[in-house]
């Protein structure tokens, strides 16, 4: 229990201190809330100087990270946290738009170029699919950051690609205890449902987009059947450690995110392990993360400039090289960066870069070719089917959460609630102090 106490204290105290320290100069503070390990810190640290050059105004960046979309959303939706810039995934952006939790990005940058215009039309079109109604232009509320696919990462010395071109190959008994699966029910559902309805897709009875966007009881049942049938092959459900197991040769296969796959491929090559990644022939999901400004943001001007800054080609390249994921920016500089002569095959990337990208020597893990991307569908919020999806996921995994992990999760939730209460009290205290000062001045 002492360890739990100190862990909770370590989580709570910084939040309380930060709340007090930054309340006084909030006007010149930019609060950025992003995924962990998802930015080049040199790019982040360079923003204040760039912002001063563009506006003549000082700003200090308060950078915080999260590991779960839902925890970030809870802080904003319930706690009314005043983060200025956040980087949610597409289904959370969809939910926040529907619940009116985002405000428009001001793209009037004066003499500063609007770098957000360099975002690929492919990404802009995909984001528009998240609109809650026909009157909403999603590009007014979010600008893409990174994107990718979910696919199969495999060890070429242990697995023949012909065996796993179809997702059904993961059910092969020879892979017993050799497959790692992402512990992400939306991502896995989006891939498996395309396999489960492959015949209906082939007959033209249903599209991939419709299958992924509209969750039904029948579709959940088919996905559950597939996952149950391959349960003996699953070595573990992971969010991060699967890629490391692949680099060590301890796992043969990993249903993985493209960015994690690329990281594993690079790391494994250094120790003589050859890994490759591809999208199953039945299709997969294409996912996006994007920058947004929540409705409780205080420094919306700096937030808008920060989003613009992140779209500068040189910054996009630095971020890609640092984190292993792919930027939505599609400028000539990015195309030049993507063209790798060491890659023998060429890909048609006109869907992303436009004319001039008909035959690019690009890494398939970074940029699927035209035929591959046509087999991918955008992941959406499950809406009122979320609980049914979670119940299915729990059955598939066997409800094997340890008591310690359950306790830890409950403590973390309590910490979040406690922190929200503390910050609310502090905010009210600051507001009351300002009101008292005004009264004193009037006297």
Where are these regions (language model features)?
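Sec-dependent N-terminal signal peptides of Gram-positive bacterial secreted proteins and lipoproteins
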Residues: 4-22, 416-421
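Early extracytoplasmic/lumenal segment of secretory-pathway proteins
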Residues: 23-99, 401-404
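Mature extracytoplasmic/periplasmic domains
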Residues: 294-373, 442
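Pocket-flanking alpha-helical
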Residues: 45, 67-104, 114-138, 262-268
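Extracytoplasmic ligand-binding site segments that recognize negatively charged/polar headgroups
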Residues: 33, 38-41, 97-250
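Extracytoplasmic/periplasmic substrate-binding proteins
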Residues: 232-296, 337
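Short beta-strand and adjacent tight-turn residues that come in two discontinuous sequence segments
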Residues: 66, 88, 181, 237, ...
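Conserved C-terminal helix/tail region of periplasmic/extracytoplasmic solute-binding proteins
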Residues: 360-443
């Amino acid at each position: 229990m002492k360890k739990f106490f100190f862990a909770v204290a370590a989580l709570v105290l910084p939040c309380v201190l930060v709340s007090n320290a930054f309340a006084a100069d909030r006007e010149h503070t930019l609060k950025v809330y992003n995924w962990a390990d998802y930015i080049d810190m040199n790019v982040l640290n360079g923003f204040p100087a760039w912002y001063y050059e563009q506006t003549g105004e000082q700003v200090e960046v308060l950078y915080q990270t999260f590991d779960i979309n839902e925890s970030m959303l809870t802080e904003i939706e319930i706690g009314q946290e005043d983060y200025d810039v956040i980087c949610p995934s597409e289904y959370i952006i969809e939910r926040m738009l529907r619940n009116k939790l985002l405000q428009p990005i001001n793209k009037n940058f004066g003499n500063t170029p609007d770098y957000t215009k360099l975002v690929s039309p492919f990404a802009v079109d995909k984001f528009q699919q998240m609109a809650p109604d026909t009157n909403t232009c999603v590009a007014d509320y979010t600008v893409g950051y990174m994107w990718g696919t979910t696919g199969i990462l495999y060890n070429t010395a242990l697995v023949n690609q012909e065996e796993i071109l179809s997702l059904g190959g993961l059910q092969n008994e020879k892979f017993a205890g050799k497959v790692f699966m992402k512990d992400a029910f939306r991502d896995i559902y989006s891939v498996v449902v395309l396999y489960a309805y492959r015949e209906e897709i082939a007959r033209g009875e249903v599209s991939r987009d419709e299958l992924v966007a509209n969750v039904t009881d029948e579709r959940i049942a088919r996905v559950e059947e597939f996952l149950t049938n391959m349960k003996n092959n699953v070595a573990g459900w992971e969010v991060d450690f699967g890629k490391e197991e692949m680099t060590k040769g301890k796992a043969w296969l990993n249903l993985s995110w493209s960015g994690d796959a690329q990281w594993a491929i690079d790391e494994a090559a250094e120790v003589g392990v050859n890994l490759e990644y591809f999208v199953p022939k039945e299709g997969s999901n294409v996912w996006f993360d994007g920058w947004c400004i929540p409705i409780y943001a205080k420094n919306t001007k700096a937030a808008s400039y920060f989003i613009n800054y992140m779209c500068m080609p040189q910054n996009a390249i630095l971020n890609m090289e640092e984190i292993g994921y792919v930027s939505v920016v599609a400028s000539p500089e990015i195309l030049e960066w993507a063209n790798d002569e060491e890659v023998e095959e060429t890909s048609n990337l006109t869907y992303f870069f436009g004319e001039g990208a008909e035959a690019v020597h690009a890494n398939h893990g970074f940029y699927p070719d035209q035929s591959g991307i046509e087999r991918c569908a955008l992941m959406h919020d499950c809406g009122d089917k979320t609980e049914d999806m979670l119940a299915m996921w729990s059955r598939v995994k066997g409800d094997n959460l340890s008591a310690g992990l359950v306790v830890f999760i409950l403590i973390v939730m309590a910490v979040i609630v406690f922190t929200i209460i503390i910050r609310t009290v502090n905010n009210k205290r600051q507001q009351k102090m300002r009101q008292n000062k005004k009264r004193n001045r009037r006297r």
